[in-house]
Curated annotation (Swiss-Prot):
<protein>
    <recommendedName>
        <fullName>Phosphopantetheine adenylyltransferase</fullName>
        <ecNumber>2.7.7.3</ecNumber>
    </recommendedName>
</protein>
<keyword id="KW-0067">ATP-binding</keyword>
<feature type="binding site">
    <location>
        <begin position="89"/>
        <end position="91"/>
    </location>
    <ligand>
        <name>ATP</name>
    </ligand>
</feature>
<keyword id="KW-0963">Cytoplasm</keyword>
<feature type="site" description="Transition state stabilizer">
    <location>
        <position position="18"/>
    </location>
</feature>
<dbReference type="Pfam" id="PF01467">
    <property type="entry name" value="CTP_transf_like"/>
</dbReference>
<comment type="function">
    <text>Reversibly transfers an adenylyl group from ATP to 4'-phosphopantetheine, yielding dephospho-CoA (dPCoA) and pyrophosphate.</text>
</comment>
<feature type="binding site">
    <location>
        <position position="42"/>
    </location>
    <ligand>
        <name>substrate</name>
    </ligand>
</feature>
<keyword id="KW-0173">Coenzyme A biosynthesis</keyword>
<keyword id="KW-0460">Magnesium</keyword>
<dbReference type="GO" id="GO:0005524">
    <property type="term" value="F:ATP binding"/>
</dbReference>
<comment type="pathway">
    <text>Cofactor biosynthesis; coenzyme A biosynthesis; CoA from (R)-pantothenate: step 4/5.</text>
</comment>
<keyword id="KW-0547">Nucleotide-binding</keyword>
<feature type="binding site">
    <location>
        <position position="88"/>
    </location>
    <ligand>
        <name>substrate</name>
    </ligand>
</feature>
<dbReference type="InterPro" id="IPR014729">
    <property type="entry name" value="Rossmann-like_a/b/a_fold"/>
</dbReference>
<dbReference type="InterPro" id="IPR001980">
    <property type="entry name" value="PPAT"/>
</dbReference>
<feature type="binding site">
    <location>
        <begin position="10"/>
        <end position="11"/>
    </location>
    <ligand>
        <name>ATP</name>
    </ligand>
</feature>
Length: 158
């Protein structure tokens, strides 16, 4: 049995869709590490430190979840964490092609690393960090898409 999984992402910001997947992964695995990628090429709205803090806040009710920022290759981070599974979310069929390519590349780089795909609950299937940021940027109410702390943090950024 795989006991430790990594759910990687930029989480800029963490959404209810992410939280849904984290909660379900926490039921499937003994330990889940949320790996927050530095990913400066995406020009994140929140710093790595801010994203780590927000994800810790929204996952504090989960005893078997740890939140860690990282840079570099995901497969190297997985090895450092002694994790054998990557958890990835699929919102729509359109996500599958990219995720399939990514899973195959990760398998080539680290043969023992398996990818597991989870789909969000229907009410979260359309939520993306990009859409949430866009709505918030134009003064829209994002409270139904993100944790209260995340909504407040987005308001402060505007």
């Amino acid at each position: 049995m795989h006991t430790k999984a990594i759910y990687p992402g930029t989480f800029d910001p963490v959404t209810n869709g992410h939280t849904d997947l984290i909660e379900r992964a926490a039921k499937l695995f003994k330990q889940v590490v949320i790996g927050i990628a530095a990913n400066p090429s995406k020009q994140p709205r929140f710093s790595l430190e801010e994203r780590v803090k927000l994800v810790k806040r929204v996952t504090e009710h989960l005893d078997n979840v740890e939140v860690v920022g990282f840079s570099g290759l995901l497969v190297d981070f997985a090895k450092e964490q002694n994790a054998s599974v990557l958890v990835r979310g699929l919102r729509a069929v359109s996500d599958f092609e990219y995720e399939f390519q990514l899973a195959n590349m990760n398998r080539r780089l680290s043969a023992d690393l398996e990818s597991v795909f989870l789909t969000p609950a229907e009410e979260n299937s359309f939520i993306s960090s990009t859409l949430v940021k866009e709505v918030a940027l134009h003064g829209g109410d994002v409270s139904q898409f993100v944790h209260e702390e995340v909504a407040k943090a987005l308001q402060k950024k505007d």
